[in-house]
Amino acid sequence: MKDVQSEKDTREIPLKHVGIKKLKYPVQVLDRENKVQNTVADINMYVDLPKDFRGTHMSRFLEVFNKFHLKIDPKTIKKILDDLKQTLKAQSAKIEIMFPYFLKKKAPVTKIESYMEYLCGFSAYDGPQKCEFYTIVEVSVQTLCPCSKEISKYNAHNQRANVRIEVETSELVWFEELIEIAEDSASVPLFSLLKRPDEKFVTEKAYENPKFVEDVARDIAIRLKDNPKINWFKVEVESYESIHNHNAFACVDSTIMEV
């Protein structure tokens, strides 16, 4: 059959990334406590396309991923990138993979266990000049406004916030380690299941520990900077303000801290 993708293209324009996006696929990932966890990932995979090829072979991306989906870890992702480059005759390959990750969490007072969902994943690139690998977590937390507490006779506005941490490491850093740093740096963590004694504890703890998004970002940055396994990091904190129709945002990475 005629291979249309391999036809010669005369426009002389190379493409940086071609591939597939938003592929949903069952995967197994490493879990610090239970060794392995089954989940469903959202996956983007790309390669470069030379100027003289009309198109890439999209089906081959899934053929490659299908070999490795039962064990997603840093070593496997490196193999996926190598296989993509070899199979598609490319100079570079990139993968972005994110998935729900569940941890058992005890309520602070009653100690009742329930599962808490986090968004975790990896982003990796392998090219002629450089290789990059990032571990990513997104963690929902609570912030309570220090200014609101200071100027109010009682109470203060509080809300959920989303923390996103990306790290480049010299050795394995568990998702759980990054999740703990994010939750420890907030006014208070979130919980799936709270009874009345737990709710009282969480409400009072947040009030006693007010944080701006700037405070959360800086406190996380200090913890990451002090971790010898982490070579580079980026932190983003977005607070879904309960008394405004806009969000508050703060961002820091290790590069700016070196200046």
UniProtKB/Swiss-Prot annotation:
GO terms for molecular function: GTP cyclohydrolase I activity. The record marks C145 as: May be catalytically important. Keywords: Hydrolase. Pathway: Cofactor biosynthesis; 7,8-dihydroneopterin triphosphate biosynthesis; 7,8-dihydroneopterin triphosphate from GTP: step 1/1. It catalyses: GTP + H2O = 7,8-dihydroneopterin 3'-triphosphate + formate + H(+). The keyword Hydrolase applies. GO terms for biological process: tetrahydrofolate biosynthetic process. Pfam families: GCHY-1 (PF02649). The keyword Hydrolase applies. Its EC number is 3.5.4.16. InterPro entries: GTP_cyclohydrolase_FolE2, GTP_cyclohydrolase_FolE2/MptA. Disulfide bonds: none annotated. It comes from the Bacteria. Coiled coil: none annotated. Belongs to the GTP cyclohydrolase IV family. Converts GTP to 7,8-dihydroneopterin triphosphate. PANTHER family: GTP CYCLOHYDROLASE MPTA (PTHR36445:SF1). NCBIfam families: PRK13674.1-1. This is GTP cyclohydrolase FolE2. The gene is folE2.
